[in-house]
């Protein structure tokens, strides 16, 4: 839809409030009306939309180092074995059926015979195994490899303690895929939406760093769209996969994803008519578009928090971590950062539902802790830093985005006022921030985690001793045990109790993280676009069956 529109150069505003004033003035003057064409068809009659997304990070290899790019690419281009719709019902995709043994340890999936790669070749069980085997090589950099560990011998293979031949994945024929688990895993079906359980064409997908994943000649897809073009740091284009088994239900011919450095330029691009959808925008946009049909709000199943590096003194002292947690005024923080935020004291996302009760999971237990500045000062004194004296200057690294910059400034001021400690702020480009965190190169580091699947394990697993995302040096045998016990607990009430105990230990007793806030998803969507769906596991928008009405 946006391809024929007038374009303009986007420049990052260094004064976000000035940007808001200018945008408000333009809206008031009636200049910013979206600028959309009357038709969603290009000159040759094809239907297309353009979507603004955050900076280019990560690979498109399901076995590789997944980050933001994959989250836009995969929902449109890849079919998992099955998923769940918004009503919790199974929706078959690459699989047509499955069976599970009485002990819930053997899962057999029957694949569609009509499922084809975008080049017309069959999708087979070996393509699923290809991703799994490559992800279990630590050199792949897959942060999702830990979610393969329920499979028999997968963890041993990852740690170099078992041979690949012992992996509990069987492919007796091209269209049968069998998983044998070490123990029953009650959320195994939820894991299937993760990249490491998706196929990669064994003809081309070899290693995670060979470049095959962003090369349209070798990057095949088994979903509604395939990769047509990828220009690093600028955009990538998906085109309709005519070989898709459900191609008749796919309405769009093309989706272009454009990369933007920050939410301000994303919103500006929407207003200029350069894009049809802009997601995860700032609360300023929510205020400006109140009452307009372009505004599309969602509950993000995500938590914004900070990692403490336990290997940096004095953050190895639980009293210091607790003091910092108790000294932060989250209500004040959210008032300043934006009305799309809400204070949280949990790691598990505020808006994640408990599948058994239908209520928010975090409402099923007491709040892990309460803010208390007086107690925070006592704890800091007990740790040897009365009135903050002698406390070293710590550096907080965060992405150079408006919301994160505002958050950092508030935290710096609150910790100075309440504990008399100094925090040095270091804004980083998004990819650099990701790399610093992944390498453990930080004192304090911003983290934002959107759920990968609809279970609290997606959050609690991140603090396990063997997790790729455990960047803080956490090694807690009691915590590991609680989470492990929850894996195989079939009683949903008992399992929830174990998960709540694990979170209380990590967040309310050991204070391994500094939870900040939950967020509403602030999105701008061209009203002519229909059929956008919301992923119930992540809260993200999906476009595989979207259409344009004009």
Outline where the language-model segments fall.
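Detector for C-terminal structural segments
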Residues: 327-356, 403-412, 435-550
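N-terminal lobe/hinge region of extracytoplasmic solute-binding protein
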Residues: 52-102, 220-221
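Structural transition elements
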Residues: 341-382, 401-405
């Amino acid at each position: 839809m946006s391809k024929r529109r007038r374009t303009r150069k986007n420049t990052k505003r260094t004064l976000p409030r000035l940007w808001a004033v200018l945008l408000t003035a333009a809206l008031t003057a009636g200049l910013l009306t979206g600028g959309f064409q009357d038709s969603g068809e290009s000159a040759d009659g094809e239907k297309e939309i353009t979507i603004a997304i955050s900076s280019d990070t990560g690979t498109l290899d399901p076995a590789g180092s997944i980050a933001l790019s994959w989250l836009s690419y995969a929902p449109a281009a890849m079919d998992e074995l099955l998923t769940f719709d918004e009503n919790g019902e199974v929706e078959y995709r690459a699989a047509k059926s499955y069976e599970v043994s009485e002990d819930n340890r053997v899962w057999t999936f029957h694949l569609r015979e009509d499922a084809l790669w975008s080049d017309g070749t069959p999708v087979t069980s070996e393509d699923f195994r290809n991703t799994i085997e490559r992800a279990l090589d630590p050199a792949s950099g897959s942060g999702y490899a830990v979610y393969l560990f329920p499979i028999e011998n997968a963890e041993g293979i990852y740690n170099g303690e078992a041979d690949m031949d012992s992996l509990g994945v069987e492919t007796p024929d091209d269209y049968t895929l069998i998983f044998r688990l070490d123990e029953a895993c009650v959320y195994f079906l939820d894991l299937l939406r993760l990249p490491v359980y998706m196929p990669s064409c064994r003809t081309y997908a070899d290693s995670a760093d060979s470049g095959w994943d962003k090369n349209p000649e070798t990057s095949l897809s088994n979903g509604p769209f395939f990769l047509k073009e990828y220009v690093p740091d600028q955009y990538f284009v998906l085109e309709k996969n005519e070989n898709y088994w459900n191609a008749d239900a796919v309405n769009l011919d093309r989706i272009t994803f454009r990369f933007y450095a920050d939410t301000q330029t994303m919103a500006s691009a929407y207003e200029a008519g350069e894009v049809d959808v802009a997601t995860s925008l700032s609360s300023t946009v929510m205020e400006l578009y109140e009452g307009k049909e372009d505004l599309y709000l969602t509950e993000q199943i995500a938590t914004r928090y900070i990692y403490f590096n336990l290997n940096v003194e004095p953050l190895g002292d639980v009293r210091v971590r607790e003091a910092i947690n108790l000294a932060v005024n989250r209500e004040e923080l959210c008032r300043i950062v934006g009305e799309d935020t809400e204070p949280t004291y949990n790691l598990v996302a505020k808006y994640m539902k408990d599948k058994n009760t239908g209520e928010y999971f975090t409402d099923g237990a007491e709040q892990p802790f309460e803010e208390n500045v007086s107690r925070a000062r006592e704890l800091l004194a007990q740790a040897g830093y009365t009135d903050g004296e002698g406390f070293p200057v710590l550096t907080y690294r965060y992405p150079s985005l408006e919301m994160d910059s505002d958050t950092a400034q508030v935290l710096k001021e609150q910790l100075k006022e309440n504990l008399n400690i100094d925090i040095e702020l270091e804004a980083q480009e998004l990819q650099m921030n990701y790399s610093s965190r992944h390498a453990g190169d930080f004192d304090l580091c911003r983290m934002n985690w959107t759920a990968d699947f609809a279970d609290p394990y997606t959050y609690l697993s991140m603090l396990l001793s063997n997790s790729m995302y455990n960047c803080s040096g956490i090694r807690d045998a009691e915590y590991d045990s609680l989470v492990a016990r929850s894996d195989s607990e079939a009683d949903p009430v008992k399992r929830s109790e174990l998960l709540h105990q694990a979170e209380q230990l990590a967040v309310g007793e050991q204070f391994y993280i500094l939870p900040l806030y939950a967020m509403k998803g602030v999105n701008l969507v061209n009203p002519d676009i229909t059929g956008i769906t919301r992923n119930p596991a992540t809260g993200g928008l999906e476009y595989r069956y979207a259409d344009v009405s004009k």
